[in-house]
Amino acid sequence: MTKFSLLDHESVPKHEIISEGELKSVLSKYLIEKEQLPKIKVQDPVSKEIGAVVGDVVRITRKSQTAGEADYYRLVIE
């Protein structure tokens, strides 16, 4: 039996854990602290699938009618 991957479903946008360097760039771009980012739980099915741990920041790339694609960032919490 093959395992179903959430990330392969058309309704689930691309999720990926970003590097510390990219995180610094994002935080300086928006003039915010890491703790001010929107949150995603470590128990979220996609968080589990990508191997995210508490403290990671996840970039979610969604389709946008106006921009083509838009990036959203979430801090992984307990």
Swiss-Prot record:
Catalytic reaction equation(s): RNA(n) + a ribonucleoside 5'-triphosphate = RNA(n+1) + diphosphate
Key words of the record: Cytoplasm, DNA-directed RNA polymerase, Nucleotidyltransferase, Transcription, Transferase
Top-level division of the source organism's lineage: Archaea
Pfam families in the cross-refs: RNA_pol_Rpb5_C (PF01191)
Gene Ontology MF terms: DNA binding; DNA-directed RNA polymerase activity
Described purpose of this protein according to its UniProt entry: DNA-dependent RNA polymerase (RNAP) catalyzes the transcription of DNA into RNA using the four ribonucleoside triphosphates as substrates.
Record note on quaternary structure: Part of the RNA polymerase complex.
Protein family membership: Belongs to the archaeal Rpo5/eukaryotic RPB5 RNA polymerase subunit family.
Name recorded for this polypeptide: DNA-directed RNA polymerase subunit Rpo5
Organism: Methanosarcina acetivorans (strain ATCC 35395 / DSM 2834 / JCM 12185 / C2A)
